[in-house]
């Protein structure tokens, strides 16, 4: 899978509508900080984003969520997520379903902040509260 396609898929997965330059930069920073390779991300996406992931991938998810304002001090910020999602034109007609899913995931806590971010992301995926999973 080419990086651009992967970037779009991951961006949609993490609630951004497109892979804009700012988000691409955030992805690169989080990859470097958490020693996650493009191959690691491709493997995770190819496996259907299973809930079993290495700690560095969980921390990569935390990094992305924090930089987007969706995770603060280890707490999922459901309202910030909804504020981001309502600006994605492709999903405006699904906001009721998405809002329900986001709210279902808002109190999830993991064993640490990385685990929390990952569990929230898996919950959002399960509840079809993130673009690209409808």
UniProtKB/Swiss-Prot annotation:
Which keywords, in A-to-Z order, does the entry hold? Disulfide bond, Olfaction, Secreted, Sensory transduction, Signal, Transport
Result of changing residue 115 to H: In strain: 307A, 318A, 390A, 705A, 707A, 732A, 736A, 797A and 868A
Distribution of this protein across tissues and organs? Expressed in both gustatory and olfactory systems of larvae and adults. Expressed in antenna, proboscis and larval chemosensory organ. Expressed in five sensilla on each third antennal segment, in the pharyngeal organs and in the dorsal organ, terminal organ and the ventral pits of the third instar larvae. Also expressed in wing and tarsi.
The effect annotated for residue 72 to I is:
In strain: 774A and 786A
Q: Name one GO cellular component term.
A: extracellular space
Q: Which gene encodes it?
A: Obp56h
- Protein name as catalogued: General odorant-binding protein 56h
Q: Which organism is it from?
A: Drosophila melanogaster (Fruit fly)
Any S-S bridges, and between which cysteines?
30-63, 59-114, 105-123
Known outcome of mutating residue 54 to T: In strain: 306A, 313A, 358A, 359A, 390A, 773A, 813A and 868A
Q: Spell out the molecular function terms from Gene Ontology.
A: odorant binding
Q: Which residues form the signal peptide?
A: 1-19
Per the UniProt entry, the effect of residue 7 to G is: In strain: 357A, 774A and 786A
Concerning its family, UniProt says: Belongs to the PBP/GOBP family.
The answer on whether this UniProt entry bears the keyword Iron reads no
């Amino acid at each position: 899978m080419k990086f651009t396609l992967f970037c779009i898929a991951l961006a949609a997965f993490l609630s951004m509508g497109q892979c804009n330059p700012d988000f691409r930069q955030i992805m690169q920073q989080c990859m470097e900080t958490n020693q996650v390779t493009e191959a690691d991300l491709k493997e995770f996406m190819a496996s259907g984003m299973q809930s079993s992931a290495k700690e560095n991938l969980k921390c990569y998810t935390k990094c992305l969520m924090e930089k987007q304002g969706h995770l603060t001090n280890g707490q999922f910020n459901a309202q910030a997520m909804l504020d981001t999602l309502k600006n994605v034109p492709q999903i405006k007609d699904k906001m009721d379903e998405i809002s329900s899913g986001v709210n279902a995931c808002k109190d999830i806590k993991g064993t640490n902040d990385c685990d929390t971010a990952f569990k929230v992301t898996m919950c959002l995926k399960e509840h079809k509260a993130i673009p690209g999973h409808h």
